[in-house]
Amino acid sequence: MSDQPLRHDADKGREPRLVPGRSGTRLFSMAALLERIEDAFREEYTPDQLRQADTSQARLKLILETTDYVLAVESVRLTPDEKADLVRRAYSQLFGYGPLDSLFLDERVTTISLNGAERAAVRYGHDELVDMPLLFEDDEHLRAVVERLLIDAGAELRDDLPAIETGLTIGGRPVSMSAILPSLAFGLNVDIRLHPRLAPTLDELVQNGFMTEVALKMLRPLLASKYGFVIAGETETGKTTLLNALAQELPQQDHVVAIERTGELRLPPQITPFTVRWPVNDRPGASFSDQIQAGLSAEPNCLLLDEVRSDEPEAIAPLLELDTPPRQIWVVRGAPDHKRLQSALGMLARRAAPGQGETLVHALYERLPFIVTVARIRGRLQLFSIAEWQSRIDTDYPDYVMLMRYEEGRAQPTGNTPARWLD
């Protein structure tokens, strides 16, 4: 959306709704009344009082008292529906996320895309993004809501951090968000992804059509084996969903560590998470690379990474250089095309430690010999393929051999067999 020109009717839908006050001598917009209520509320109640109001009922009572006060002072008469809407909006602004609250409550919403205050789009389920009516009064309103989201996620908007990716939980739903500041984009750009309250299991992924029983019968032995693998797919294709389901069935005797960017995974208690931390005030942050080092220091025998990115190749160098590395399961962003995937992974390994030639490329093939790809096809998330790097005697580079491949609406066996033994 960012490359589109501003609409000529950008203010359409923001026309103020006016109500009379002060015995008819003045007109107030609903937005102005809302602002007055917010200001009066902040002046009236101390942080200690707000902490004591720890239920929605207690908070609504305080907001209703403030609303009644402002309406009385300004001699404004509203209908019961108008007053209820004003109280709801004040609650959302003071204790929630403003116009995003209704979207967060909608279980169908999986993505919210914001390009400044002028454009908003929503994805329902796994369909395409659809444009929304204007959500924010102006850029300042958008920024205030984004700042509140970031604060609740343990981050903050900073001029020295033009791009932030973090996560939080809203209404029991894991939420990841990325924000790009105007220094890198036209206006404040925000993408928000929402996961379901209950993460699907592997069996439920079969039931909802993500994959077949045949595919699961190949994945479970792979999961129980000693071999590492990559889960690859483009944005919002089910990579984290699949990793989360797999993590629930990892052998419990394994010492497993998960390195996460946004904390989207719902991990069983025996898995230790290390999540990226952003600097806040004087508190230093911890990058993805930092957390990989911290995770390795815990001496796990299995390491989950969600997700490996091409713009941080140095982060994976220790994983490919260790003489006795842990088993590794990577989530990687990329198209489920074997030529492009092989090229991207090879380039990632070469850039991880320039000067080592093809050493780390071969290490990647050895430590991550299986590849599982996922895709969004006709509005549904699908397991696209399962493949293996299989050695050849006539070259140092392995073949990408498909074991399962998407055809006729589902991933099906190709007839090729794994070169490595899977129980």
Where are these regions (language model features)?
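N-terminal accessory targeting/assembly segments
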Residues: 1-157, 168
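P-loop NTP-binding catalytic core
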Residues: 115, 119-225
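Hydrophobic anchor at the beta1->P-loop junction of P-loop NTPases
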Residues: 231-233
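Walker A (P-loop) phosphate-binding loop of P-loop NTPases
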Residues: 236
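Conserved lysine of the Walker
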Residues: 239
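Switch/coupling sub-region of P-loop NTPases
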Residues: 245-365
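Phosphate-binding/switch region of NTP-binding enzymes
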Residues: 360-394
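NTP-binding/hydrolysis catalytic cores, primarily Walker-type P-loop NTPases
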Residues: 380-423
